[in-house]
């Protein structure tokens, strides 16, 4: 299996890129979020990859972050979601938005992605719950590190994602961690 490619970016044609690794050119399919974060053609690039072998093709999918690759791996485990659909989901909303939609059980956000209907969205919410990593979900709700710490504390105290996210929204953006926890607990106790 090919887990990572590092080389020179030769071509960028969404959703495909061509990466030269010591004289061998690899065609890699990437999400649009990864595509927009790629360097200019001719510069060095490093992509985490997932190699998919099918009856009629061998495809290499590339990701800018480990979280995006993990989300892709979780998505393709779901019945009815193949690699192309998974890439479309990650292109349409990104990992943080996907994690937030799953934690808040918002099927409407998933339905906005081309190729995802209501039933598929509901299946995604059901099967992805708790699988995208707590840190990704926490960071999805938080605007900054202080808010992420406050949210993590609320989750550790036993509040669910919806309660903690609602309390976080009520806080000023520039609040400190200890003051934010106090204010959030006060609002949750009402």
UniProtKB/Swiss-Prot annotation:
<dbReference type="GO" id="GO:0006310">
    <property type="term" value="P:DNA recombination"/>
</dbReference>
<dbReference type="Pfam" id="PF01330">
    <property type="entry name" value="RuvA_N"/>
</dbReference>
<feature type="region of interest" description="Domain II">
    <location>
        <begin position="65"/>
        <end position="137"/>
    </location>
</feature>
<feature type="region of interest" description="Domain III">
    <location>
        <begin position="142"/>
        <end position="190"/>
    </location>
</feature>
<dbReference type="GO" id="GO:0009379">
    <property type="term" value="C:Holliday junction helicase complex"/>
</dbReference>
<dbReference type="InterPro" id="IPR011114">
    <property type="entry name" value="RuvA_C"/>
</dbReference>
<keyword id="KW-0238">DNA-binding</keyword>
<dbReference type="GO" id="GO:0005737">
    <property type="term" value="C:cytoplasm"/>
</dbReference>
<feature type="region of interest" description="Flexible linker">
    <location>
        <begin position="137"/>
        <end position="141"/>
    </location>
</feature>
<dbReference type="Pfam" id="PF07499">
    <property type="entry name" value="RuvA_C"/>
</dbReference>
<protein>
    <recommendedName>
        <fullName>Holliday junction branch migration complex subunit RuvA</fullName>
    </recommendedName>
</protein>
<dbReference type="Pfam" id="PF14520">
    <property type="entry name" value="HHH_5"/>
</dbReference>
<dbReference type="InterPro" id="IPR000085">
    <property type="entry name" value="RuvA"/>
</dbReference>
<keyword id="KW-0234">DNA repair</keyword>
<dbReference type="GO" id="GO:0048476">
    <property type="term" value="C:Holliday junction resolvase complex"/>
</dbReference>
<dbReference type="GO" id="GO:0005524">
    <property type="term" value="F:ATP binding"/>
</dbReference>
<dbReference type="GO" id="GO:0006281">
    <property type="term" value="P:DNA repair"/>
</dbReference>
<dbReference type="GO" id="GO:0000400">
    <property type="term" value="F:four-way junction DNA binding"/>
</dbReference>
<dbReference type="InterPro" id="IPR036267">
    <property type="entry name" value="RuvA_C_sf"/>
</dbReference>
<keyword id="KW-0227">DNA damage</keyword>
<comment type="similarity">
    <text>Belongs to the RuvA family.</text>
</comment>
<dbReference type="InterPro" id="IPR012340">
    <property type="entry name" value="NA-bd_OB-fold"/>
</dbReference>
<dbReference type="InterPro" id="IPR003583">
    <property type="entry name" value="Hlx-hairpin-Hlx_DNA-bd_motif"/>
</dbReference>
<dbReference type="GO" id="GO:0009378">
    <property type="term" value="F:four-way junction helicase activity"/>
</dbReference>
<comment type="function">
    <text>The RuvA-RuvB-RuvC complex processes Holliday junction (HJ) DNA during genetic recombination and DNA repair, while the RuvA-RuvB complex plays an important role in the rescue of blocked DNA replication forks via replication fork reversal (RFR). RuvA specifically binds to HJ cruciform DNA, conferring on it an open structure. The RuvB hexamer acts as an ATP-dependent pump, pulling dsDNA into and through the RuvAB complex. HJ branch migration allows RuvC to scan DNA until it finds its consensus sequence, where it cleaves and resolves the cruciform DNA.</text>
</comment>
<dbReference type="InterPro" id="IPR010994">
    <property type="entry name" value="RuvA_2-like"/>
</dbReference>
<keyword id="KW-0233">DNA recombination</keyword>
<feature type="region of interest" description="Domain I">
    <location>
        <begin position="1"/>
        <end position="64"/>
    </location>
</feature>
<comment type="subunit">
    <text>Homotetramer. Forms an RuvA(8)-RuvB(12)-Holliday junction (HJ) complex. HJ DNA is sandwiched between 2 RuvA tetramers; dsDNA enters through RuvA and exits via RuvB. An RuvB hexamer assembles on each DNA strand where it exits the tetramer. Each RuvB hexamer is contacted by two RuvA subunits (via domain III) on 2 adjacent RuvB subunits; this complex drives branch migration. In the full resolvosome a probable DNA-RuvA(4)-RuvB(12)-RuvC(2) complex forms which resolves the HJ.</text>
</comment>
<dbReference type="InterPro" id="IPR013849">
    <property type="entry name" value="DNA_helicase_Holl-junc_RuvA_I"/>
</dbReference>
<keyword id="KW-0963">Cytoplasm</keyword>
